[in-house]
């Protein structure tokens, strides 16, 4: 990571007032599990125009995350270029979230242990939870 987008830890995230949480993983990853109240914006199919329409206040606090923080940094950088002023990258992504016993939910908003690990290489970073490929 180049750290263009400042990190926010899990504890810091929990103290934020009404953050907009954006999941920058692919839809199939989001469908397996995601952090509650997150909105899927994708990575390969990220659509800046639709994000701007949905979140028009450039002063809103936005927290982006992915598996470990690489893709979310890329999307966070795009958001900054669109004019968003308060963009943060969730440190360690959904893997760090799950490794710290934080809940993730499936598409039915049911708590699940499943986490899409993106690849075998990245799967080593998920210590807790059930790895899904």
Name each region found by the language model:
Residues 13, 20-25, 38:
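Short hydrophobic beta-strand that contains or immediately precedes a catalytic carboxylate
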Residues 1-4, 15, 20:
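N-terminal capping/interface segment
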Residues 67-71:
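Gly/Ser/Thr-rich loops at beta-strand to alpha-helix junctions
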Residues 1-10, 31-60, 73-133:
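Rhodanese-like catalytic fold shared by cysteine-dependent sulfurtransferases
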Residues 18-19, 59-61:
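A general structural motif
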């Amino acid at each position: 990571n180049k750290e263009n987008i400042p990190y926010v830890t899990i504890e810091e995230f929990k103290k934020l007032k009404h953050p907009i949480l954006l999941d920058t993983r692919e839809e199939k990853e989001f469908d397996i599990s995601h952090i509650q109240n997150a909105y899927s914006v994708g990575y390969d199919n990220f659509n800046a125009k639709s994000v701007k329409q949905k979140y028009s206040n450039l002063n809103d606090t936005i927290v982006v995350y992915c598996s470990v923080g690489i893709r979310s940094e890329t999307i966070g950088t795009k958001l900054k270029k669109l004019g968003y002023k308060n963009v943060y990258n969730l440190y360690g992504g959904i893997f760090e979230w799950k490794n710290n016993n934080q809940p993730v939910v499936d598409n039915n908003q049911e708590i699940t242990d499943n986490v899409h690990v993106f690849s075998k290489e990245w799967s080593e970073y998920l210590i807790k939870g059930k790895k899904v490929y």
